[in-house]
Amino acid sequence: YATIGPDDIGGVMLSGHSDVVPTRGQHWNSDPYQIKSDDNAFYGRGACDMKGFIACALASVPQMVDLKLKTPIHLAFSYDEEIGCVGVKKLINVMEDFEIKPRIGLIGEPTDMKMIIGHKGKAAFKVILTGSSCHSAYITNGVNAVEYAAELVSFIRKMNLKMQQQPLDNS
């Protein structure tokens, strides 16, 4: 995390992750970790997700410094996003203690060069279902947690299918 410009107002955060999806099982015609260029396009592992954005942000730092910015630019880069967003958790923990936080964030995820107001996300929950044991002769006196877990999984799958059939918003 770094700030260019004043540190007494929120400013703009440029954020991205520095890792890439592993290449295992992918077929490349050349070394994916060696960048190649062709007709003003660059090819290589992570060129659009998200190393291109990070390279542009870092290459702009000298100009940002020279401009004597009145509104700060915050560079907030994380790691291990592709395997569970490990690095961003630590970044968030650090930023939570800041008295003055960025007012807006620009995340350099690939979006076909369109500005959007959101991007895919993830929510994880831990669910504990507790049953009630009983003798097999009196099963109506018990509660089978596995049956309720199966119903819950079925409900979640139906909701997922319903969401896939709905039109998406612009994010």
Predicted regions and their residues:
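Short, conserved glycine- and acidic-residue-centered signature motifs
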Residues: 43, 49-53, 142-145
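Acidic/His- and Gly-rich active-site-bordering loop/insert found
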Residues: 1-45, 66-69
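Acidic/histidine-rich catalytic neighborhood of metal-dependent amide-processing enzymes
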Residues: 50-124
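Glycine- and other small-residue-rich loops at beta-strand/loop junctions that grip anionic moieties
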Residues: 46, 80, 138
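Midchain, well-structured core segments that form catalytic/ion-binding scaffolds
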Residues: 89, 95-171
